[in-house]
Structures are given as C-alpha cells and as structure tokens.
Amino acid sequence: MIVFFPACLRHFRLCAWHEEGAPGPEERPKAFLSRTMSSQHDDEAQKEAAFAAEHLAAESMAADMDPWVVFDARKTPRAEFEEWLQTYQPSRVSRFGDPERNAEPVGWIAVYGPSFCPEGGDVVGLQEDWERLQGSGRHITFDTVKELALNRRVLTGKWLMHLDSGFKVDHAWRGIARAALEGRIGVAKVSPCCPDSERKQVICVYTEDFTNEEQVLVADAVIRATGVKCLLSYKPDVYTYLGIYRDNRWHLCPTIYESKFDLECIPRRSRIINKVNNTEVT
C-alpha cells in the first residue's frame, strides 16, 4: 500500500451575509411585517446554503488530509498494477477504515500517470486575493474567479462522475485507472466507499488547465473511450480551494462543463455544454 499525505492544507472562510436595507417611514405601516418575515426567510435560506457549502468544504478537506492509497506509475513497476487494482477496489475500501481489521481511514484511491507532475500555482496567494476580492465590493462572477486563478497559476480542473458503489464504480475505475497508467490522462482518483451510506462514489479525472477547452474535451474523449457513459461534470480546482460549492452565496455554478453521452447519435459521442455561456461545444 502506497500512502500519500497532501502537503498543502486548504483554508476556508465562511462569509457574512448582507441584509437588505429597512423600508422607509412611509412604507412601514404596510410593508414592515411582510418584509421582516421575508427577510427572516431569506436569512434562514442563506444560512442553510452557507452551512451546506461549509459542510461540503469540511468533508473535502478531511478526505484530502487523510492518507491516500496511490499507485505511482513513475516509480512502481507496471507488473504490480493488476494486483494493486484488485486489492484496492473502491467498493471494498472503507472511507473511515475498519478497527476490527486494523484498517485506517482512506481519503482517496489514486493513480499517477508516468508523466504526472504535481500541480503548481500559488494557492496561499490565491486565497489571500480571494479575501481581498470579497472585501472590495466587486461583483463576483466566473470571470473574476478565473482572473484570480490565472494570476496565481492555479489552473487544474477535473471531470467528475458519480457512480453507485459496487460493480459500476469498480468497473469504471478499472478503465480510468488503466488510462492513467498508460499516460492517456495524467492523474485520476476515486473516493472510497461509505458502507452505511447510500451516497454514490465519485471518480475524478484531472486536466492541467481548465481555461484550455481543447484539453478538457480531450480528457472527456479518453473517459468515454474507457466505456463510461454516465453524466460528467467539470469543475475547476480554484473553486475547491476557495470553498465554492453548490448553494454558495454568489450563485456560482461550481461546474463549468457538462457532458452527456448520446446513445442515439451515430457514431456515439459526448454532447458537451459550456455552462458558463450555455453553449454546446461538441
């Protein structure tokens, strides 16, 4: 078993919500009660969304900080790959370990391809820029977040696929892991199972630059060539580093591409939507 401890810890900040101004004196007799109730409802919805985003961020950070099971094709003989793959099938590796078998928690199972190079970029500087951006009063959009990522060279991103635990995730992971071993993708990882949960497991396939659309599309083609036909979503890592998950206060969609496999098209292919500008790119 090869164990990897991430060197970079992520920092997250839960931002305060801004309330609307109170109604003027002439409005209060008619509107004060309804606006107060509406404001309270909005505050509750915002708090729930903030809690959900914070919870997802905490879960992600916890998984990243726990030991990873890694097959590193740069160092490990390929002859050992099949045994490793069989030993660490994602549906049989427990996220929280097994005290009875003296098994420790596992954050992720990953394969590093032969040309894998750890991501660069200034994550700490990125997070400092993010703090300043939030305090500046500027409207926060995909383009402003992209600007931060470009300035700090934090450009990696990943295709995500969510699969039922058991045969489906094990079969899909086998194809994806082999693609990484052969160098068709740089790195891929899969979440371990949670035995007492119905939550699906997720496979992530990384690209070096989320702003390079051609690179993103090539990775989708590699995934489809392994036989994966489920819905795929693409998320820039900058969103993860900044703690931007679904239901965030800026109403940003944390995924910027969506890929659906068209079974009726001949030849069969992906239909990929750019979710930022709502255009079909394939």
Identify the meaning behind each predicted range:
Residues 1-3:
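Short hydrophobic transmembrane-like helices used for membrane targeting/insertion
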Residues 5-6, 34:
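Intrinsically disordered and other compositionally biased segments
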Residues 17, 29-155, 246-282:
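Charge-rich, low-complexity segments
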Residues 21-24:
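Residue-identity detector for glycine
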Residues 128-281:
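Extended amphipathic alpha-helical regions
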